[in-house]
Amino acid sequence: GIELFMMLAKNPAGANQNLRTLLLEEEKIHLAVLLNDRTADGKDVSWIWDVDYELVVDRLASLTIGGDRAYDLALRFHYSGFPIASMHVTPSPLGLLEHLKSSIKAGEKAIILPTYTAMLDLRSELNKMGATHSFWEEQ
């Protein structure tokens, strides 16, 4: 299978720090970014325009975009210089996970940058797949 690494990105400061961390990767990066605008995330998603996605655009092997506001995020990546035709956009967390599983070679890893509720949605789907456990369960 593939390895998934989740790094919470809920504001420009955190997202930019995550992106700088990704620059330490030697290989090209399979990146998935999810943006929700639910109450726990904050309704205003204009902060995505303050994130320096341009830092990693040239380092991406693939880009998958999801969440309730996936199309806003796709537009932001378009303006960062990433070609729209090369993005895979799916609002569905399950659809995003299925795409990653089918498009990334076994043994490779994907980095996932979700907002808070998108992380909860992803963990719920991963739990249903048997790939992780619920937060409150002991390992």
Label every PLM stretch briefly.
Residues 1-139:
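ATP-dependent carboxylate-amine ligase
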